[in-house]
């Protein structure tokens, strides 16, 4: 299957650079995955499409202020470090710019010595393994010294970093936000609960691989990045009960989808409490075992994410919906509008 099958024309001005003042005021395209029929709504009206007994699955990961600016201890040369993944303890997989002169043994310092690091290893894709040292708690030091790493297609500085967090973000560890969840407010979640819809949480820490372009011609040859996930006993029990009682499981975001499909795929369609790493790659031909519907944003051409939504709703339905979205001037990507596939 050729990657070019997932291409579409997107005018640059439709890439949302800032979030709307009101999270739930985003537009919502509702796509019937069986017929391809489209309806246009406001996100707040998503509640009309949820039934008592359904279950929304949200990713409660929290984005780290993962970009650090520091200098090499020996020369004073400036460096930019992006935290990608915690390996164990204080060892992290990172991207360092400029990276060529940061070799094993190189020492780095940040915030006038409040945070220090030594390079332990060089990785295949150009990454570096750094081991950090500091006083106190790492995430408190990071909160003081780090910056929020916005996606590469967002050029404007964000006035309020909390707008790149969901209102329910709890478990710190992501390099990017699970953006489908950015549209929900506390009031909307309360109203959904009052309707009799279950709301449960999983955690998947989003890596920057989510923005990595597919660099092969054939979809099947793409090397998918791995991300850490976990599901609690309470969430697993609720999901199994919803499934047994005929309710729909609706994932909020591709990250929730990847978690649910990873677990259901391992356990014959059932959910169990577990944690681990997933590199599941979902594209057309995949048979879904965990979800019935999906809330998601509008994705980049030729990305693994547009392949995932095409697996759920059909490639032709998705590409037609995206053509309509461009014509109707929907806002695209992380700060853009949303789609509900049911």
Swiss-Prot record:
Provide the protein's localization.
Cytoplasm
Instruction: Name the keywords, alphabetized.
Output: Cytoplasm, Queuosine biosynthesis, S-adenosyl-L-methionine, Transferase
Can you state which reaction this protein catalyses? Answer: 7-aminomethyl-7-carbaguanosine(34) in tRNA + S-adenosyl-L-methionine = epoxyqueuosine(34) in tRNA + adenine + L-methionine + 2 H(+)
Q: Which GO terms describe its molecular function?
A: S-adenosylmethionine:tRNA ribosyltransferase-isomerase activity
One Pfam family assigned to this protein is Queuosine_synth
Q: Name one GO biological process term.
A: tRNA wobble guanine modification
| Physiological role | Transfers and isomerizes the ribose moiety from AdoMet to the 7-aminomethyl group of 7-deazaguanine (preQ1-tRNA) to give epoxyqueuosine (oQ-tRNA).
HAMAP family attached to this UniProt entry:
QueA
Q: How does it assemble?
A: Monomer.
UniProt name for this protein: S-adenosylmethionine:tRNA ribosyltransferase-isomerase
Read off the lineage from the record.
Bacteria, Bacillati, Bacillota, Bacilli, Bacillales
């Amino acid at each position: 299957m050729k990657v070019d099958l997932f291409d579409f024309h997107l005018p640059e001005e439709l890439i949302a650079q800032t979030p709307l003042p009101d999270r739930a005021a985003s537009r919502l395209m509702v796509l019937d995955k069986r017929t391809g029929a489209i309806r246009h709504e406001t996100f707040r009206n998503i509640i009309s499409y949820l039934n008592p007994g359904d279950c929304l699955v949200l990713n409660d990961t929290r984005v780290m202020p993962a970009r650090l600016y520091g200098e090499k201890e020996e020369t004073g040369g400036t460096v930019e470090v992006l935290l990608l993944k915690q390996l164990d303890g204080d060892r992290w997989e990172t991207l360092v710019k400029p990276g060529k002169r940061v070799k094993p043994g190189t020492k780095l310092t940040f915030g006038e010595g409040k945070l220090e690091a030594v390079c332990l290893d060089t990785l295949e894709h150009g990454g570096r393994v750094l081991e950090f040292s500091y006083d106190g708690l790492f995430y408190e030091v990071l909160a003081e010294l780090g910056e929020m790493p916005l996606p590469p297609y967002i050029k404007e500085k964000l006035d309020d970093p909390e707008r790149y967090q969901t209102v329910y973000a709890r478990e710190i560890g992501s390099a990017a936000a699970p953006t489908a969840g950015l549209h929900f407010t506390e009031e909307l979640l309360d109203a959904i609960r009052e309707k009799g819809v279950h709301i449960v949480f999983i955690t998947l820490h989003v890596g920057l691989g989510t923005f990595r372009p597919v660099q092969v011609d054939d979809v099947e040859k793409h090397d998918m990045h791995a991300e850490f996930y976990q599901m609690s006993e309470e969430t697993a029990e609720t999901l199994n009960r919803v499934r047994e009682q005929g309710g729909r499981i609706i994932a909020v975001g591709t990250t929730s989808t990847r978690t649910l499909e990873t677990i259901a795929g391992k356990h014959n369609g059932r959910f169990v409490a577990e944690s681990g790493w997933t590199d599941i790659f979902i594209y057309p031909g995949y048979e879904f075992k965990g979800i019935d519907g999906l809330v998601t944003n509008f994705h980049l051409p030729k990305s693994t994410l547009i392949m995932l939504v095409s697996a759920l709703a059909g490639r032709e339905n998705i590409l037609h919906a995206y053509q309509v979205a461009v014509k109707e001037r929907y806002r695209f990507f992380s700060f853009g509008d949303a789609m509900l596939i049911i």
